[in-house]
UniProtKB/Swiss-Prot annotation:
Family of this protein: Belongs to the peptidase M36 family.
SUPFAM superfamilies in UniProt: Metalloproteases ('zincins'), catalytic domain
Species annotation: Aspergillus oryzae (strain ATCC 42149 / RIB 40) (Yellow koji mold)
Name of this protein: Extracellular metalloproteinase NpI
Residue stretch(es) of the prosequence: 19-245
Keyword Ribonucleoprotein set for record: no
Keyword Secreted: yes
Cellular localisation: Secreted
Binding site residues for Zn(2+): H429, H433
Amino acid sequence: MRGLLLAGALGLPLAVLAHPTHHAHGLQRRTVDLNSFRLHQAAKYINATESSSDVSSSFSPFTEQSYVETATQLVKNILPDATFRVVKDHYIGSNGVAHVNFRQTAHGLDIDNADFNVNVGKNGKIFSYGHSFYTGKIPDANPLTKRDYTDPVAALRGTNEALQLSITLDQVSTEATEDKESFNFKGVSGTVSDPKAQLVYLVKEDGSLALTWKVETDIDSNWLLTYIDANTGKDVHGVVDYVAEADYQVYAWGINDPTEGPRTVISDPWDSSASAFTWISDGENNYTTTRGNNGIAQSNPTGGSQYLKNYRPDSPDLKFQYPYSLNATPPESYIDASITQLFYTANTYHDLLYTLGFNEEAGNFQYDNNGKGGAGNDYVILNAQDGSGTNNANFATPPDGQPGRMRMYIWTESQPYRDGSFEAGIVIHEYTHGLSNRLTGGPANSRCLNALESGGMGEGWGDFMATAIRLKAGDTHSTDYTMGEWAANKKGGIRAYPFSTSLETNPLTYTSLNELDEVHAIGAVWANVLYELLWNLIDKHGKNDGPKPEFKDGVPTDGKYLAMKLVIDGMALQPCNPNCVQARDAILDADKALTDGANKCEIWKAFAKRGLGEGAEYHASRRVGSDKVPSDAC
C-alpha cells in the first residue's frame, strides 16, 4: 500500500524523490512495498438517468429523516438480500444534494470495503449512487459463535512482522471497546498512539470474502489500516495508508513562491463566514501564537509526533512579522517566517474551501464546529521544517474527528536549501489530500482513495487546485504551469510535463495510464484533464482574479471558481475508490445539480480532448480511450 511518496506526498516524476532521509523517536520506516497491498477497485457509479431503481418521495419539507429513508429504500431495492448499516456522516451539501453512506454487514460485522453512497437531489428523488457491496454468498457460520479465529494480539504481531513495522510488543495487552470485537492495545512502543484492532470482513481481490482483523497502527511516517487474515494471523489481504504524503508578513494568496512577488503585511486575513472564531481562537481560548480553530503550526526539527509543546512564534501584539531572505541559511534562522507562512496558507485555503462547500458537515478540519454538525477536535497539525525527511511533504487524513497532519520539509536541491512552506502550491496540494479523502465516501471513511487509479486522482486534485489558485490576471487558455519548480530548483517542475491545453506541450491522455503504475504519474494525467476543464469554463464565464468567489444563486459567477466548485462537489458524489470515468461522470452530475447542466458541453469537450469522452472505459488491466463528445452535449 501507500508509502510516503505513494500517498499524500508530493513526489518527483521519475523517483527523483525517494524517501525522507531520517526518522526520530524510534519510529522506523518499513521496507515492505505497501503499494502491493492496495485494495482493489470495484465500485459502480450510476446517475438518475441510468437508474431503473429511482425512488420517489412525497415528503415535504426536505428533512434528514426523509432523505435518509429515501436513500435506505434505494439500497433495499437494489440489493434486497443485503444487510447494512447507515454510517453516521450524512449531510446536505452546499449544492442542495444530500449525501448518505452505508456499510454492508454480515453476522453483525462490517464488510469493511463494501460501501454504498446515495445522493438525494433537492426534489427528494435519487440523484445518483455508487456502491461496492458484496453480492456473493455470505458464510453460513457466524464466526462470533464458533470463535475459532486468532486473537487480536496475534493479529498485531502478524501485522508487525508482515509489514516490518518495528513495533515493540513485549508488554502488549488488550482493552475491549464498546464496539463489537474491537480492542485497543496497551504496552506498545514504536507507535504514535495505541494501536487498535477490530474484527471485520473484507472482500478480497478474487471476489471472495475473508474474515480479518483490521489493525490500525500510526507509526508517524505511515498511518496504516492492515487487514490480516483472522484465521492464519499472517496473511495480509489489504492495507490502507491515511498518509498521502492579526498581521502576517507573508507571500500573499495567489503568489505561489518567492519568484512571483514580494512578502507583504496582511491584517486580519480571515473570512469570518468561514472562520467564525478567527484564525487565532478556537472558541474557548484566544491565542497569540500560530494556533487556532483551523490549525496549529509549529517547528518540528526532530520529526517527532508530539507537537503541542513544540516551538511556535508568540506575538502578544499579534504582529507576526519576521525576517526572511532567499539567501538566508541555515533554515532554522528563519523558522518564525516559515511557521507564519504555513499557518497563513493553510488557513486561507481552509476559508476558501469552506465557501466552496467543504464545511463542518462535509468533514472539514476544525477544533470546534460551533454546533454546525460534523465531528470537531480535528484541526490540522502543521509542521514546518519537519525533520522526518527532505525534498517532500505529506498529509495524513484520518476520519472526521481526528486531526489531519501535514509535514513540510526542507528541500536540498539548491544552495542555500529551500523551505517547502514558502511554495503555496505544495501546501495546497497536501491540504487537498484532506479535502478529497474526507469528501470521497463520506467524512467517516478515509480509505476511499486507496486503489491505484483513485489514489492517482488524489494526487491530481492536489495539483489542480494548486494550479487553479495561482492563475494570474493575464493568463489565457495557452498559459502553461509547472508544479514544485521553485522548491525543487528544477526547471520544468516535478511532473513529467507542464499542465497545458496544448497536446504538443503535454501529450498525456487517459490511455497514458496503461503505461503508468505510480500515483503521482497518474495524478499528472488527471490534473491536466481538469486543467482543460478549468480553461473551458473560464473561456465561457470569465475569470475572477480575487481571493474568493462571488456567487449568484449558489453558483460561482466565474469559470475558475466554478471549476473548483464542480470538482469539489464531484468528490462528494462519486463512489468509494472511483476510477477516472466515474469521477468524470460525478463532475457532470455536479454540474447538473448546481447549474442544471448548463456547462455540459464545455465539460464533455475537456474530457473528450484527453481521452475520457463518451465510450471511454476503465478495466483493471487496461483503459480504453475515446475522444467522442455525446451528440446531445453541445
